[in-house]
Amino acid sequence: MRINELARQHATELDALIDGALILDSQKFGLNCDNEMAAIFYYPISIGNPFQSLYYSKFLENGIVPIGTNNLSNVASIRWPGKMFLHLHWLGNIIGDTENSDVANQRVEEFLQQIDAMKDNGFNIIWTVHNILPHDAVLQDCQIKLRVELVKRCDIIHTMCGDTIQLSEAFFSLPEDKIVNVPHPTYETFYPTQYSDLESRFQLNINHDEFVFLFFGSIQAYKGLHDLVRAFKELDSRTDKKLKLIIAGKVFNQSNFKTIKNEIDASENIALFQNRIPNEDVQHYFKAANICVCPYRITLNSGVAHLSHTFGTPVIGPNVGGFKELLSGGGGYTYEQLNFEDLVLAMEKSLTMDFDKERKKILKINQKYNPDKISSQFAEIISRGGADD
């Protein structure tokens, strides 16, 4: 997979395809074998997010060569005797950060023309709906147009939660006959997990008697950090328990963050780790925490929720999309989205949570979201070229 520094060993996407084909041929996949060989090019490559690493991890074993690309022109003209797929992920960079609608519409048209040409060349188009619209969408009409037109061209639309069709309806329609639903995986086996909860608290200088709420991941306006800080302070005023809030993640917009940072700096029991967290340190934040809070104002699927469960840490999240499905059988609490008091109540409820009981539930829940199982399931669907019956 062309998803990290190892990708440099393949000079081009075509080289990667040839190398992958040779590997599959040795495993009895190919034109002269009982098992068909396929190729899937995915766009764009997300190096900082292990989602793609996990989702494609079992593809070669299922006869599919996964190859990442950040330039569709590099793969558009490739011809292949087996099935070829273009797998689209996040669409935000197609329009980019322009605020000029004419420029945006031109970029949409150029992208769609490229997709049409790839379909003419034999590519099947797959789109994974990670979010309904980009969280920071400026030219919403252009973003909607892009998705409306892309849906028409898709052979497979991949959703990761059952709410996707309903939540999309206000902007665009998703035809059910194109949809396959395979959930977001946990991050099992990806992140190191050797340290104890006690060691993790020691590393982060957290006392054993503190009840710790965690906000983890990139700090962006739509994630509702302002709401969480307010809710934390409100709860702190209602209880005698020693509370602590850990905020760990990279800030995307410093000007938006300035106001809330003043509140954080003025609070002795809020700790801010304002950087991207190295993979080897991720475990410390979740193991030191009692519960992870995702106070998102906009959400569809949440990798952070699954990351939290990977370490056995319960989650609080809004009662929509992936959170609603993930937490329906335990492993945390949901609250009514955009309802501040309900967020406070969910956090208050967590103070008396039976954590041993919830961790047992999480272990059971994680079986459904095992990354090897998810990758194999998705690969089998792709091999069939259609919906999961």
Where are these regions (language model features)?
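Acidic anion/phosphate-binding donor-loop and adjacent secondary structure
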Residues: 169, 186-203, 209, 385-386
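Conserved donor-binding/catalytic core segment of Leloir-type glycosyltransferases
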Residues: 207-223, 229-232, 245-246
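Acidic donor-binding loop of glycosyltransferase active sites
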Residues: 284-300, 310-313
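Nucleotide-activated donor-binding/catalytic signature segment of Leloir-type glycosyltransferases, i.e.
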Residues: 249, 257-283
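Conserved acidic donor-binding segment of nucleotide-sugar-dependent glycosyltransferases
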Residues: 329, 333-341, 347-354
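Short acidic/histidine- and often glycine-rich active-site loop of Leloir-type glycosyltransferases
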Residues: 306-307, 320-329, 333-334
